[in-house]
Amino acid sequence: YKEIIMRYSKLTMLIPCALLLSACTTVTPAYKDNGTRSGPCVEGGPDNVAQQFYDYRILHRSNDITALRPYLSDKLATLLSDASRDNNHRELLTNDPFSSRTTLPESARVASASTIPNRDARNIPLRVDLKQGDQSWQDEVLMIQEGQCWVIDDVRYLGGSVHATAGTLRQSIENR
């Protein structure tokens, strides 16, 4: 009888210790918060947001920074807004600053982010297959996380006959 009581007393001591230990551990969320975001947000992962951006641009055929704001990082939106008031950037911004070519594409297909090996990455470059008539080319968008939002932070021009002054949108605006 004494042996049974000893076994149960050890068990009754073990249960509160296990509960206390589990209360002291923390769970790390899958996506960490990367600061704040001052602008509106588009729902979805990096590839989904990038595809929505290109779909919106093809449908509306406009470079209106205010309308594109939910898709752009705070820094890129500020750079584009400042550049729109600078005559040196007028040609870049009246053409298509988000593509290697001067004219807007008719179609765009963003590569899947599932091919990215590091799922915790905060900067995700995604290839974009663009098409206008019989011409096809490829560019790359850099997606970053601001707060809980995935947004475009830069465009790398890979499409051959580049109209911009540098290899990326940011470099072209910053005159690098």
Show where each model-derived region lies.
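Bacterial signal peptide processing site
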Residues: 25-27
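Core segments of small alpha/beta cavity-forming domains
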Residues: 34-91
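Short beta-strand edge segments in extracellular beta-sheet folds
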Residues: 142-144
